[in-house]
Amino acid sequence: MKQNKYDDSVFFSEYENMPRSTKGLNGAGEWPVLKALLPEFKNKSVLDLGCGFGWHCRYAREQQACSVIGVDISEKMLQKAHEMTSDPSISYINMPIEDINFPDSQFDIIISSLAFHYIKSFEAICKKTYRFLKPGGSLVFSVEHPIFTSRNEQDWYYDSQGNRLHWPVDNYQTEGVRNTTFLTENVIKYHRTFSTYINDLIHAGFKINAVKEPMATEEMVKNVPEMKDENRRPMFLIILAEK
């Protein structure tokens, strides 16, 4: 199923007001960890899968990438990306990630931010990205952590006073569809285990260079005290793999 909630006007309006939409990369809590894993962009060709507003595309060009292609299923997302981009070396393609097709060995770097957990077959994406990368090329991506996606509810257990007791994990080994809620809308995500992420990459031919589970920094907790609970369970998984 190729899901496109972002072209729904109400859903998009809510997404547009999220911190990661209004503040860009600095509004994404996992960005410092993802940024630290990114390879050298200078004179590199880059593909961004699930590019959204194009923040990572523009960052790659700021770091002197020679060309960048952003792919997204949402027309509204790409309309916003075009409005924010005035660089002929960045191009955007309106297409589901599942349907991408590029020549072998076209890209030096492929990046994806919080998109692959909306894709049914991670195995297929691994095979495609491996083929699209040049030898020595890098795949860097973030997804919602399997501990976060295991249950449909994707929420804490609370006591009668509304205090967060713990983050429940259930049906972890049962991969597949999770009917969950995001921005008050019903959204389909695909849960897979930590080992599936790793093994699908290895089976496609990738070498795993780094695996990160970002934590809320002291500064984040100081500015937003509720963020301390984010360190009670991982929300994101970030992986750097090399062809």
Predicted segments with their positions:
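Conserved class I S-adenosyl-L-methionine
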Residues: M1-F41, W55-Y59, K80, M84, L139-G176
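Class I SAM-dependent methyltransferase SAM/SAH-binding core
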Residues: L47-L49, F53-I100
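A short acidic, Gly/Pro-enriched loop at the edge of an enzyme's catalytic core
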Residues: E98-I110
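A short SAM/SAH-binding and catalytic strip from SAM-dependent methyltransferases
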Residues: D108-E123
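A short glycine-rich, Lys/Arg-flanked "PGG" loop and its adjoining helix->strand segment in the class I
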Residues: E123-S138
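Short alpha-helix
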Residues: I188-V211
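Core SAM-dependent methyltransferase catalytic element
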Residues: A204-F206, V224-K243
